[in-house]
Regions:
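Feature marking long nucleic-acid-engaging regions of large polymerase/nuclease enzymes
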Residues: 19-196
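Extended, highly charged
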Residues: 1-17
């Protein structure tokens, strides 16, 4: 099922978006941190409203017009307003650093969590002789092959994405909310489903 999530004051259309409902333990509404920016949510006691859609037609219309995926790009300046914050950016930074190796077990767990069904990256040996994946190879798997991009990261490193293959360290300028060049390119080129 889907429901409309809202944080007042509703200053723009991204103040009300449709989320897929998943029932969990506890008595609080929870949502992915990536959508904090459009809601202007900062977890200091923000009140959020949940509107349950009554009819099947209204649910279908809301899915088409108001899904979070349809609002990754803001109409204000055309950039990605929904994007990585906090742990998303830290994880991308750590994975994309040169020399980062992830054990095959952890790499397969990460790829399984995103539903990856494609081919796997090349297996390399770490300093202890264990099978591992390079962090940049794991990131390159999930970036579409038609993405070609060059930009400077916030740490002044050159980031190059060619045919979906990443070279350079990813940070907020790559995947961050309101600044994510890579995220913006994926959404602009391949649509909101791929960007999400």
């Amino acid at each position: 099922d889907v429901a409309i999530f809202n944080r007042q004051p509703s200053l723009h259309r991204m103040s009300m978006m449709v989320h897929e409902v998943r029932v969990m333990q506890g008595h609080t509404f929870r949502f992915n941190l990536a959508v904090c920016t459009p809601y202007n949510a900062d977890f200091d006691g923000d009140e959020m409203n949940l509107h349950v859609i009554q009819s099947e037609e209204a649910r279908a219309e809301a899915k088409i017009l108001m899904r979070v995926q349809e609002h990754i790009l803001t109409p204000r300046y055309g950039g990605a307003v929904i994007g990585g914050i906090h742990d998303h950016i830290s994880g991308a930074y750590l994975l994309s650093r040169p020399g980062t190796l992830i054990s095959v077990e952890h790499g397969l767990e990460m790829l399984g969590n995103i539903g990856w069904t494609g081919s796997l990256p090349e297996v390399v040996k770490d300093q202890n002789g264990r099978d591992s994946f390079r962090g940049q190879d794991i990131i390159s798997l999930i970036i579409p092959d038609n993405i070609h991009l060059r930009f400077r990261s916030r740490s002044n490193d050159d980031v190059v994405v060619k045919n979906g293959s990443v070279e350079g360290i990813l940070d907020k300028r790559a995947i961050g909310a309101e600044d994510g060049r890579l995220l913006d390119a994926i959404v602009q080129t391949n649509g909101p489903e791929q960007g999400a």
